[in-house]
Amino acid sequence: MNEKKIIESGKAILGIEFGSTRIKAVLIDPENRPISQGSFEWENKLVDGLWTYSLDAIWNGLRECYANLRKNVKQTYDAEIETLAAIGISAMMHGYMAFNKKEEILVPFRTWRNTNTAKAANELSKLFNFNIPLRWSISHLYQCILDKEEHVQNIDFLTTLAGYIHWQLTGVKALGVGDASGMFPIDSATKDYDAAMIEKFNQHIAHNHFHWNILDILPKVLLAGENAGVLTEKGALLIDPSGHLKSELPVCPPEGDAGTGMVATNAIKQRTGNVSAGTSSFSMIVLEKQLSKPYEMIDMVTTPDGSPVAMVHCNNCTSDLNSWVNLFKEYQQLIGIKVDMNEVFGKLYNHALEGDKDCGGLIAYNYISGEPVTGLAEGRPLFVRSANDKFNLANFMRANLYASVGVLKIGNDILFNEEKIHVDRITAHGGLFKTKGVGQRILAAALNSPISVMETAGEGGAWGIALLAGYLINKAVNQSLADYLDEKVFIGNIGTEITPTAEEVEGFNTYIENYKVGLPIEQTAVKFKK
């Protein structure tokens, strides 16, 4: 069946993801291949000192993104979308959307970017003996309680952006377990909110005499593939005001961008992981069991089917590296050589592989902004060497490439060395891997693990949530999400894999020891360079 017939007969599946700067829709066929897409750019706004998106911006963004998809489908296939096999919604995780009994929002949506929750996160981490990050919904809620915000007593429902949109489209107050794990800790045995922590929280806030307890106001937790309701008539018109899109379509549990990223890179099985490396970076390793104790630099979330995931998030990755590459571009322009940025990156990155495995003693700190993992509230990009270090272009570029994943290594070394976590495969995606084979080899040395890069990983979260919508309707009886992805989606495609050599691993370890010893240099730069 060709694409036009697939669309017109309602066999296509739609995934929509709300990222922080772009809303993206992907339409896939029954074989899980993307056949069309649409997008819409949007921006958060700083209102009264807090980052937010208005409800109008959310619904306008959804309509515009879907209209762009419809237009592309019309142009490419001369077809109209009337009905779909299934729909999935995903969005950036965490943050705070609180509603009263009348379904009115009580304060403007507070996004994950807000860092006004330090006191709450700190107290809750101690109360639960579990690392609660600043951006989690429970940190936002507890900070509102500490700040004695009036609206708290009127809360009837608390959810994330994906949970809010799903609720409006279906009438169902539910959340996929991955997104839920960024609201409140999940017990990986029950695959639901941690009952002991729920009890502790309720007791801790009891003196406020709110009419609710925390379990009353959180969304119901659902696993991938579970029934999460259908698109209502109201919901269909919210997506497509033209009235073409029919209601009563199955909608899968809404998920967060971490979960859809795991799906898009086939990193759902225990002992697999994925790394995203661009302006910032993060790694997610799927664990066989919970960690022995909490670590401030490791966030615990889950896969969309409820396995525990250890996440290390770094604020800085490629920005400083890009600034150095731009310096070489300026030099080329100065001496009158035509500039092709892909060539500049390619030549410099590949030349880095000819450098010493320990970068000849050179160290770079790529801190454009602060870096919580290494305890810095602010950053100053810094390159440092001793007079007798081996200073040449290959070592210089290699040191800067190492720096781009250095903090990620420090966080993951805790997992691999202290917690003795084992990983069979890590899939990488993002701008760092655009030059074939270089960023991948550097990351393999950093994490002492084979690293795969897939062609499809660039499709990202909108494709990931479309795959979860496909799993809802197409899974076989008792077929796990990991098996479904292996058998129906990736079918043996692990992309190109690079395994590090012992010398590369040893070289990176030497570099990172020098890097850690030198951190006071970076702290001093922050103190004295304004």
Where are these regions (language model features)?
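Carbohydrate-associated surface elements
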Residues: 114
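Active-site donor-binding loop signature of nucleotide-sugar glycosyltransferases
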Residues: 40-42, 111, 223, 367, ...
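A general alpha-helical scaffold signature found inside nucleotide-binding enzyme cores
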Residues: 53, 57-61, 139, 438, ...
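Active-site core segments that coordinate phosphate-bearing ligands/cofactors
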Residues: 2-8, 14-15, 81, 122-135, ...
